[in-house]
């Protein structure tokens, strides 16, 4: 329970980037969770559920800025301050991400017991010591998993763990607050350079360092390939007009009484099918908000706020559980989980939160 709670808190703390968070949490907690006999599916679920669901609730993230920019100019939302006020009012009504984050904490603490495929995965890990199922294909190369520590060198926790983690968080947070976006790629790059120099200082031969770099690059190829394929499918879906078709098909069912719920379902389906939450926002928000304002005579009422939250929550649902989503792929990569196993074990939890949010 303690390891799972640490992973949960760590994911919430790294709120500023939905891409950085699952990769960071999975990588940092991977070996620790293995020793605690926590399945890879469980770790990837925790990492994934504290990524996009957290980012969309915090008003100082790229997600918030993007959602607010889509609202400016619609109805009585004239300025950025108006959009920010709308976003803040929508947080308590953004049920899906709230439920998703809370459910992780309840499960990690043992208050809510695992169910569905996740229960079987956890039972396998605890009773058989298998954090991966037999025949699973983890989204990182086996070379990285099976890599052994260099013999003859005493491990230095400060240089090999504490400093790199602090560097990544400091650079990512620093660039987020100073430049407006978290430079996660640069954070990892500079940390890798530091790690290479640190290994040399500790007496590890240059040849061994370069072999380690090669193994790391090789192990990342499966994840990069899957991401490229996911982006290709997303682009194809956009070209075919899948999202627009879904919206037009549901337009006849929209009435004030069910408007937020229908918008939420449409956004969920669209985001899951395309794997793109931001693409869903871009298509749904310009339709949902004008519809809501049409029923309120241009006034910012609870209906408008609820529709804004429905688009945000529905988009996060797709980003959270679609196998095409980059954050879902990165969660599998960071935890070293089989991607399909991660999706299958997480889906019942996501659907539970989705049904509760719909109700």
Q: Could you say what each language-model-derived stretch is?
A:
Residues 2-80, 273-317, 327-343:
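Hydrophobic transmembrane alpha-helices that form the pore/transport pathway of multi-pass ion
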Residues 86-94, 152-156, 176-189, 249-255:
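Interfacial loop-to-helix junctions that mark the boundaries of transmembrane helices
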Residues 1-6, 36-43, 93-95, 158, ...:
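Membrane-interfacial loop-to-helix junctions in multi-pass transporters
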Residues 100-177, 188-212, 334, 341-344:
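Long, contiguous bundles of hydrophobic transmembrane helices that form the permeation core
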Residues 158, 180-201, 208-242, 257-269, ...:
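Core transmembrane alpha-helical segments of multi-pass membrane transporters/permeases
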Residues 56-61, 97, 164, 168, ...:
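Hydrophobic alpha-helical transmembrane segments in multi-pass membrane proteins
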Residues 75-80, 113, 172-182, 201-207, ...:
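Transmembrane helix-loop junctions in multi-pass membrane proteins
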Residues 54-143, 309-359:
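Juxtamembrane and boundary regions of transmembrane helices in multi-pass small-molecule transporters
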């Amino acid at each position: 329970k303690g390891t799972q709670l640490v992973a949960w808190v760590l994911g919430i703390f790294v709120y500023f980037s939905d891409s950085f968070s699952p990769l960071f949490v999975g990588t940092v907690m991977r070996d620790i969770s293995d020793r605690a006999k926590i399945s890879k599916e469980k770790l990837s679920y925790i990492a994934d559920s504290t990524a996009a669901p957290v980012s969309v609730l915090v008003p100082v993230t790229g997600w918030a800025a993007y959602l607010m920019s889509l609202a400016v100019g619609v109805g009585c939302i004239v300025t950025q301050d108006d959009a920010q006020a709308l976003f803040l009012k929508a947080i308590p009504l953004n049920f899906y991400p709230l439920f998703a984050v809370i459910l992780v904490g309840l499960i990690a603490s043992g208050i809510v017991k695992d169910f569905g495929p996740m229960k079987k995965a956890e039972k396998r890990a605890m009773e058989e010591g298998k954090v991966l199922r037999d025949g699973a294909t983890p989204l990182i190369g086996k070379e990285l998993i099976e890599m052994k520590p260099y013999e003859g060198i005493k491990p230095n926790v400060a240089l090999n763990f504490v400093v790199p983690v602090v560097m990544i968080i400091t650079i990512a947070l620093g660039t987020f607050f100073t430049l407006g976006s978290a430079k996660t790629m640069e954070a990892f790059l500079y940390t890798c350079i530091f790690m290479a120099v640190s290994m040399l200082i500790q007496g590890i031969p240059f040849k061994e360092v370069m072999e380690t770099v090669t193994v790391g690059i090789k192990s990342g190829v499966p994840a990069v390939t899957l991401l490229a394929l996911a982006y290709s499918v997303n682009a194809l879906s956009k070209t075919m007009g899948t999202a627009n078709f879904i919206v037009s098909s549901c337009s006849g069912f929209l009435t004030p009484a069910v408007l937020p719920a229908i918008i939420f379902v449409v956004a969920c389906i669209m985001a899951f099918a395309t794997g793109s939450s931001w693409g869903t926002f871009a298509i749904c928000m310009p339709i949902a908000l004008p519809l809501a304002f049409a029923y309120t005579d241009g006034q910012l009422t609870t209906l408008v706020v609820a529709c804004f939250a429905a688009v945000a929550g529905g988009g996060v649902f797709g980003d959270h559980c679609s196998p095409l989503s980059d954050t879902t792929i990165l969660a599998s990569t960071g935890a070293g989980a089989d991607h399909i196993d991660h999706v299958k074990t997480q889906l019942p939890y996501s659907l539970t939160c989705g049904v509760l949010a719909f109700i």
